[in-house]
């Protein structure tokens, strides 16, 4: 961490609102030199990379309505302040949505999971959970002067909600359906994933696929889904579609081509296991 970042961190003004309306008012009032935080693990990573901190930090940790886990016959509701470790261990989640608790074991190192929150993972728009949540059809409850419920995919793509606070995620239960999740590379490092891929085989015979990595916003792989659902699909053609569609970029550690190949290989293995030609 360079000296400029260290000095800026020492001058951060911390705000601790107790309610959503208070937190949102602070974010509006102090913009653009402000950010919201809960576990702050992403901020730590950004600072370590040399990104200068904002002058104001609004902690969401005192907002009780962002806590709590509940289940119904159809959905699991998880408060935004729930830690990734709690997502991994909570008995309600393990019983109702085991694929989600299993995925939590693959996200980051244990020390990070104890601090990082599901709300922060989603709010970053580059979180490792997002591909899985996309294929599960998750919805968010966000606060932007009022509580708004909307699909995760819409929130990721619409600029209208860029200042909204992610208060809760609502996840449909996927009972009787096979779901897969793979995080590739650098699991135990304090860095993001090299690639993340997720899929869900629905009871109606359709499929959902999504992928992403630490530097880009994950998205559904709609062309690849359509290829797989076409009668007599060809594995070679589907592989080429995956390589073309995977939304990956290069960084100093890894090329986009390597990421694409690694993710396409694990996705193809799952598709072939489900019923390849």
UniProtKB/Swiss-Prot annotation:
Keywords: FAD, Flavoprotein, NAD, Oxidoreductase, Purine metabolism
InterPro entries attached to this UniProt entry: CO_DH_flav_C_dom_sf (IPR036683), Diverse_Substr_Oxidored (IPR051312), FAD-bd_PCMH (IPR016166), FAD-bd_PCMH-like_sf (IPR036318), FAD-bd_PCMH_sub2 (IPR016169), Mopterin_DH_FAD-bd (IPR002346), Xanthine_dehydrogenase_csu (IPR017612)
Pfam families: FAD_binding_5
PROSITE patterns according to UniProt: FAD_PCMH
SUPFAM superfamilies on file: CO dehydrogenase flavoprotein C-terminal domain-like, FAD-binding/transporter-associated domain-like
Gene Ontology biological process terms from the UniProt entry: hypoxanthine catabolic process
Superkingdom of the organism of origin: Bacteria
Induction: Expression is very low in excess nitrogen (glutamate plus ammonia) and is induced during limiting-nitrogen conditions (glutamate). Expression decreases when allantoin is added during limiting-nitrogen conditions.
Function: Oxidizes hypoxanthine and xanthine to uric acid.
Name this protein carries in UniProt: Probable xanthine dehydrogenase subunit C
Gene: pucC
């Amino acid at each position: 961490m360079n000296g400029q970042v260290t000095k800026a961190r020492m001058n951060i003004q911390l705000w601790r609102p107790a309610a959503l309306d208070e937190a949102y008012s602070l974010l509006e009032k102090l913009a653009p030199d402000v950010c919201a935080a809960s576990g702050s693990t992403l901020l730590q990573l950004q600072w370590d990379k040399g990104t200068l901190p904002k002058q104001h930090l609004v902690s969401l940790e005192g907002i009780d309505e962002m806590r709590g886990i509940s289940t119904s016959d159809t959905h699991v509701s998880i408060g935004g302040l729930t830690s990734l470790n709690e997502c991994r261990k909570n008995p309600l989640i393990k019983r109702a949505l085991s694929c989600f608790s299993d995925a939590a074991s693959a996200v980051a190192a244990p020390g990070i999971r104890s601090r990082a929150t599901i709300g922060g993972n989603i709010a970053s728009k580059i979180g490792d959970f997002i591909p899985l949540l996309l294929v599960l059809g998750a919805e968010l409850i966000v606060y932007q002067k009022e509580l708004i419920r909307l699909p995760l995919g819409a929130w990721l793509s619409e600029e209208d909600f860029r200042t909204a606070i992610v208060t809760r995620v609502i996840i449909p239960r996927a009972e009787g359906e096979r779901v897969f999740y793979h995080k590739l590379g650098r699991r135990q490092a304090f860095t993001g994933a090299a690639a993340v891929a997720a899929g869900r085989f629905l009871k109606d015979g359709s499929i959902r696929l999504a992928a992403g990595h630490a530097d880009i916003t994950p998205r559904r792989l709609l062309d690849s889904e359509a290829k797989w659902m076409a009668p007599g699909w060809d594995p070679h053609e589907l592989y080429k579609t995956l390589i073309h569609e995977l939304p990956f970029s290069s960084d100093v550690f890894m090329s986009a081509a390597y990421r694409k190949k690694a993710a396409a290989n694990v996705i193809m293995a799952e598709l072939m296991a489900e019923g390849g030609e």
